[in-house]
Amino acid sequence: AQFNMSYSMQQVAFLALESVPVILFDYQGVGETEGEARLDNLDKDAGAVWECVKNSDLIKGRKLVLFGQGVGADAALRFYLSHKDQVKGVVLESIYASQKGLIQERHGFILGDLLARTLKETDIQPAQAITLVTCPLVVVNPGKDNFVRKGQRKLFEFSLPKQAEIWNVPGKNYLCVFADNNSPVREKLLDFIKNVD
């Protein structure tokens, strides 16, 4: 299944090879997990995983660098808001301004509006949450992003705090920026993770 933990493995395996501890998990109802996938549960799923691993020998005493893509970036922002003191950096790829806005822009005027009306949004939207991020922050924009459209990207970037870096990556699709073994952005991400405080 696309967008589950096994699909994301190649995008972060290079970090583990560089001795960066990596925690991957499937949200409820995705991959091998049971339950129902819901937007309002994604950050709670991340929190449950964090509670399970934070006292392990490999992790104990370390602060997190959150890395989320698409809906995972939305969840990473909400996780950050309830764990600020445990996070030292945030990296977001293909992040949108609002959940309903993403649906409307992806599916067009009529269908997008109908689908957006049925969506149960979370209490805080990414464009609101991002204004509360105080740690170092990177936003990764694939040049051929087929997940987040330009309107949502611009609305989100308008809300960015001043410490945010934007990495525009020409020629790459959503979920492909870090999957390429020859990607120079991999080194940039590794440098960010190792040097952020």
Report each predicted region and the residues it spans.
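Membrane-embedded segments
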Residues: 1-52, 62
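Alpha/beta-hydrolase fold nucleophile elbow
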Residues: 58-70
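Short beta-strand immediately N-terminal to the catalytic nucleophile in serine-hydrolase-like folds
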Residues: 66-68, 93, 140
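Hydrolase active-site cap/lid region
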Residues: 75-129, 135, 179
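Short alpha-helix in the alpha/beta-hydrolase fold that links the catalytic acid
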Residues: 126, 135, 149-158
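Short beta-strand/loop motif that positions the catalytic acidic residue
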Residues: 132-134, 138-141, 145
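Acidic catalytic loop of the alpha/beta-hydrolase fold
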Residues: 144-148, 174-176
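Catalytic histidine-centered segment of alpha/beta-hydrolase-like enzymes
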Residues: 172-184
